[in-house]
Amino acid sequence: MNPQIILASSSPRRNSLLAETGLKFKTVPSYIDEKAKYLENAEKFALRIAKEKALKSSLIADGIIIAADTVIKLDNSIVGKPKNEKDALRILSLLSGKKHTVITGLAVYDTSKKKFYTKCVKTYVTMDVLSLEQIKSYV
């Protein structure tokens, strides 16, 4: 019998991406504290959060658990997820006209073997200079 595949995410985009593979899966969102540890670099942070999400979902379901976390690194600092619309405006203004790195940590956890398979992917982005009006219309 094949193990069930579990997506440890509430992200509609991640759900859509996995659905495009044609695999049958169950969604078991995991809510964890997503704060960076003191002096933790962005790559280790993204992988740690992805692994913690997978482990949290493994408390509810068995199988192959897929979890991911994406962060932005700007000038060696982690840019957190926006807390609200005002914060989203602040973050996009901060990124406007600058180079930054988008880092996704992926963790696949096999609950039967208690084994992780991980990968970290970096995308280098140069954002155009955006006006406040452009940023507001995007948000």
Predicted segments with their positions:
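N-terminal beta1-alpha1 ligand-phosphate binding loop
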Residues: 2-23
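Anionic-ligand binding patches
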Residues: 2-4, 41-139
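Short linear Ser/Thr-Pro motifs
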Residues: 8-11, 30, 96
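Short, glycine/serine-rich, charged loops/turns that create anion-binding
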Residues: 12, 32, 113
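Short loop/helix-cap segments at secondary-structure boundaries that form the rim of catalytic
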Residues: 16-20, 37, 59-60
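A short beta-strand-loop structural module common to alpha/beta enzyme folds
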Residues: 24-35
